[in-house]
């Protein structure tokens, strides 16, 4: 029996209308053999958490450039926990000031990937940190 594929939800919360980076990451994860669900633009934390629950994902990747990471990301983590998804990794990618990273990690974000991070690094992080179970 083979291990099931890692399932990742890639989400764009808030009013940010730039999704090129999220689409690049989604394609890279697919190319690496992961199942990827892309939510599209302008998602609320509630929409993201609901999609994560419905899709039974292992990780949620939040692409954010709007500067609202300090409110949106902790809210997404909170909603996932409320839905019993404590083991779901939450990753953030985008423009996040270095000084905000500790606050995000304290709120439950597993990792923050800044501009210039290679897609290989993101794939490796997911493979190393998602607890895979056999189908």
Task: Pin down the residues of each PLM region.
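Short, flexible coil/linker segments at domain boundaries that flank nucleotide/cofactor-interacting
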Residues: 1-5, 85
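N-terminal pre-triad scaffold of radical SAM enzymes
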Residues: 11-15
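Cofactor-cradling patches in redox/metallo enzymes
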Residues: 22-127, 132
């Amino acid at each position: 029996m083979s291990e099931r594929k890692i399932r990742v939800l890639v989400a764009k919360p808030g009013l940010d209308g730039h999704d090129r980076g999220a689409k690049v990451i989604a394609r890279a994860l697919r190319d690496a053999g992961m199942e990827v669900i892309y939510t599209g633009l302008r998602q609320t934390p509630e929409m993201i958490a609901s999609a994560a629950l419905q899709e039974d994902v292992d990780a949620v990747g939040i692409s954010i450039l709007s500067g609202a990471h300090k409110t949106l990301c902790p809210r997404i983590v909170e909603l996932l926990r409320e839905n019993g998804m404590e083991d779901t990794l939450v990753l953030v990618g985008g423009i996040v000031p270095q000084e905000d990273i500790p606050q995000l990690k304290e709120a439950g974000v597993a990792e923050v990937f800044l501009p210039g991070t290679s897609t290989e690094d993101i794939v490796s992080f997911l493979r190393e940190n998602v607890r895979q179970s056999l189908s």
